[in-house]
Structure formats: C-alpha cells, structure tokens
C-alpha cells in the first residue's frame, strides 16, 4: 500500500501491475533520452554564435527527424498494445464477483454462490481501532483467493464511479446501465486498498475498497461461514 511522502508506485501484487511498471520504466527512459537531447541542442544554440548552414536546409536532416520519431513511437506502442490485450483477456475465470457502485458505498455479489452478497461501507474515524487506517477501512472486506483468475464485473446503480486498486493495476469505470469487466490475479496474500477514482458527489472521498487475498482453503472457509 502507499505510505507518506511516497514518490514511486506501490509494490506490484499482480502480473499485470508488474508489466505496467516495466512499461513505465521503458517509456520513462525514452522520454529522458529525448529530453536530454533537446536540452543539449538548446544549450548549444544559446551558447554559440555560430550558425550551422549545412543543417539549416538539408534533405538528410528532414528525413532523419521524420523517421526517428516514428521509430520511437513504435517502440512505445508495441509494449503498450501487448499490455492492453493482456488486461482485456479473460480465459476461464475461477470466480466471478459483481461490484456495484452506489452513493457512497460498494456492494458485492459472488455470482458463483447462491446467496453471497454484502455492502461495504467506510468505517467512520470515530469507530476505528488502533492500527486501522483512516478513510481506508471498511466494515466488510472483499475476500478473494490468491493465485487464481478472478473476473470482476463492475457497474453502478446511480452515477459514475470508478473501482480502483493501484497495487493490482486495476482501475475500471462503474457506469450506470453498462457492465464492465476486468481480470484480477494476486500473486501473494495480504490486504490491498483502493478508492473510488471518479468524482461522484459530496462523499466521493469516503468510498474505500479493501481486498483481502487469502489462500484457497481460507477462502472456502470464509465463504462457507458467509452462506
């Protein structure tokens, strides 16, 4: 999860988030090299009074600065498209969970079970126990099995919301009348926090998301206790 004065991303908990972090580093390096080159050219132009007449009007230079940006864009686009298709691919999910956004709480339905549904509200600051996180704790956590493909179906009952868990690389809009889906695969157990990421009214900041990823055996015990 995030911590005070954090400058980087949260630690990746899913294969998709790991790919996104690698893509970020790849793109950042390209941007850094381009920025360094531009800064060098500007500095050299400002610090010298000489004019390079051979480069002011040259067919070779125009060819280079047309082809080189195209190559750079391809180097950025190819890994981006690969990750995009990975995020949209859902093959034989082990579990499906339907998430509905409300003003201002989330409701969850485990569609593979007969009657496993609950609402998830933020715990007020006055009711927090020692060690619990302000504005991030909920009364009912979403318990899910780790290392299994889980399909999340996301929609809304009223206005636009967005279901986001940064450490898993998830951010999917909850749109009234539309059912969006995303894939969730957690590589290790733990508590993972998120929040509504679409301004949805006066209590938008009070719609936290808490996922509790556990081994399959513990998930089966939890689901049996909830039925």
UniProtKB/Swiss-Prot annotation:
Molecular function in Gene Ontology: copper ion binding; cytochrome-c oxidase activity
Biological processes annotated in GO: ATP synthesis coupled electron transport
Broad class of where this protein is predominantly found: mitochondrion
Reaction(s) catalysed (UniProt annotation): 4 Fe(II)-[cytochrome c] + O2 + 8 H(+)(in) = 4 Fe(III)-[cytochrome c] + 2 H2O + 4 H(+)(out)
CC cofactor note: Binds a dinuclear copper A center per subunit.
Membrane-spanning ranges: 15-45, 60-87
Topological relation to the membrane, as annotated: Multi-pass membrane protein
Binding site for Cu cation A2: 196, 198, 200, 204
Pfam family for this entry, one: COX2_TM
A GO CC term assigned to this protein in UniProt: respiratory chain complex IV
Alphabetically ordered keywords of this record: Copper, Electron transport, Magnesium, Membrane, Metal-binding, Mitochondrion, Mitochondrion inner membrane, Respiratory chain, Translocase, Transmembrane, Transmembrane helix, Transport
InterPro entries reported in the protein's UniProt record: CcO_II, CcO_II-like_C, CcO_II_C, Copper_CuA, Cupredoxin, Cyt_c_oxidase_su2, Cyt_c_oxidase_su2_TM_dom, Cyt_c_oxidase_su2_TM_sf
Cofactors demanded by this protein: Cu cation
The protein's Enzyme Commission number: 7.1.1.9
Membrane side Mitochondrial matrix: residue ranges: 46-59
Residue ranges annotated as Mitochondrial intermembrane topological domain: 1-14, 88-227
Chain positions recorded as Mg(2+) binding sites: 198
Enzyme type, top EC level: translocase
Record bears the keyword Electron transport: yes
Sites where the protein binds Cu cation A1: 161, 196, 200, 207
UniProt family annotation: Belongs to the cytochrome c oxidase subunit 2 family.
Annotated function: Component of the cytochrome c oxidase, the last enzyme in the mitochondrial electron transport chain which drives oxidative phosphorylation. The respiratory chain contains 3 multisubunit complexes succinate dehydrogenase (complex II, CII), ubiquinol-cytochrome c oxidoreductase (cytochrome b-c1 complex, complex III, CIII) and cytochrome c oxidase (complex IV, CIV), that cooperate to transfer electrons derived from NADH and succinate to molecular oxygen, creating an electrochemical gradient over the inner membrane that drives transmembrane transport and the ATP synthase.
Subunit description: Component of the cytochrome c oxidase (complex IV, CIV), a multisubunit enzyme composed of 14 subunits. The complex is composed of a catalytic core of 3 subunits MT-CO1, MT-CO2 and MT-CO3, encoded in the mitochondrial DNA, and 11 supernumerary subunits COX4I, COX5A, COX5B, COX6A, COX6B, COX6C, COX7A, COX7B, COX7C, COX8 and NDUFA4, which are encoded in the nuclear genome.
UniProt protein name: Cytochrome c oxidase subunit 2
Biological classification of the source: Eukaryota, Metazoa, Chordata, Craniata, Vertebrata
């Amino acid at each position: 999860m995030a911590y005070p004065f954090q400058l980087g991303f949260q630690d990746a908990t899913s294969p998709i988030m790991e790919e996104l972090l690698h893509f970020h580093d790849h793109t950042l390096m390209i941007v850094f090299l381009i920025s360094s080159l531009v800064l060098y050219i500007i500095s050299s132009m400002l610090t010298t009074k000489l004019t390079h007449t051979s480069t002011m009007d040259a067919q070779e230079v125009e060819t280079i600065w047309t082809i080189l940006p195209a190559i750079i864009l391809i180097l950025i686009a190819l890994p981006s498209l690969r990750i995009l298709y990975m995020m949209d691919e859902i093959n034989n999910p082990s579990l499906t969970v339907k998430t509905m956004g409300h003003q201002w709480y989330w409701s969850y339905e485990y569609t593979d079970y007969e009657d496993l549904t609950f609402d998830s509200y933020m715990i007020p600051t006055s009711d927090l126990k020692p060690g619990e996180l302000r504005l991030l704790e909920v009364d009912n956590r979403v318990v899910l099995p780790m290392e299994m493909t889980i399909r999340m179906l996301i929609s809304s009952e009223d206005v636009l919301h967005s279901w986001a868990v940064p450490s898993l690389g998830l951010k999917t809009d909850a749109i009234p009348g539309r059912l969006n889906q995303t894939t969730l695969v957690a590589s290790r157990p733990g508590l993972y926090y998120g929040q509504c990421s679409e301004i949805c009214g006066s209590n938008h900041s009070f719609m936290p998301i808490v996922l509790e990823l556990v081994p399959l055996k513990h998930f089966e015990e939890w689901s049996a206790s909830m039925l």
